[in-house]
């Protein structure tokens, strides 16, 4: 029905498209703009994550620790694609191709909070993405750092949540992931048979 008629009644809105179980609800606490603690509920997986800097991180009462992977070639990474990927040439396609050929594999889950939680749990070795909002990042960033991982922006600088560009790893892979990101240039849209609208 039209939006005007929907406003007249109660609605339930959910974000579990197609029954895909990788969705989450996350809450982060910031201190002076920096994530201090985070809690992430993943009902589709029956998992609850929480962590606090200096105290540690857990999933369903099991302690979390980032992976011990040392070499990018042995790593399993995760990324995502921003909502405006069809409108920008800086759309992460080049980075996805680059790392797909230089790692054990790259996954795309779709929930930034869970991607970060999986890095904190050592299931994934690293994560990068652009186009994120502070509410996408706050809880997961706290988890990764509480579990012994490293967080920064694409330039290796301390993360400012407002930039929307994050790199998260177990620590050992941080220089390798940053080096790869620096080497990537946007792919010409013709290589993936698309047209990007002209704009800034």
Residue ranges and their predicted role:
Residues 6, 22, 54, 74, ...:
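ATP/adenylate-binding site constellation spanning eukaryotic-like Ser/Thr protein kinases
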Residues 10, 14-58:
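DPxDG-like acidic metal-binding loop motif
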Residues 2, 18, 174:
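Histidine-centered active-site/metal-ligand motif
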Residues 65-200:
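An extended, acidic
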């Amino acid at each position: 029905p039209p939006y005007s008629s929907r406003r007249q009644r109660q609605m339930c809105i959910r974000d579990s498209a197609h029954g895909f179980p990788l969705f989450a609800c996350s809450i982060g606490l910031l201190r002076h703009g920096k994530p201090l603690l985070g809690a992430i509920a993943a009902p589709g997986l029956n998992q609850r994550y929480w962590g606090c800097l200096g105290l540690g991180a857990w999933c369903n009462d099991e302690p979390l620790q980032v992976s011990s992977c040392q070499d990018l070639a042995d790593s399993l990474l995760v990324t995502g694609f921003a909502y405006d990927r069809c409108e920008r040439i800086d759309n992460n396609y080049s980075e996805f191709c680059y790392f797909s050929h230089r790692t054990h594999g790259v996954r795309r889950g779709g929930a930034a909070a869970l991607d970060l939680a999986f890095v904190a749990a050592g299931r994934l070795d690293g994560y990068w993405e652009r186009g994120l909002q502070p509410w996408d990042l706050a809880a997961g960033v706290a988890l990764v750092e509480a579990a012994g991982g490293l967080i920064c922006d694409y330039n290796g600088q301390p993360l400012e949540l407002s930039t929307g560009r994050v790199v998260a790893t177990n620590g050992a892979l941080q220089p390798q992931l940053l080096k790869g990101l620096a080497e990537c240039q946007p792919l010409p849209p013709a290589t993936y048979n698309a047209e990007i609208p002209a704009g800034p």
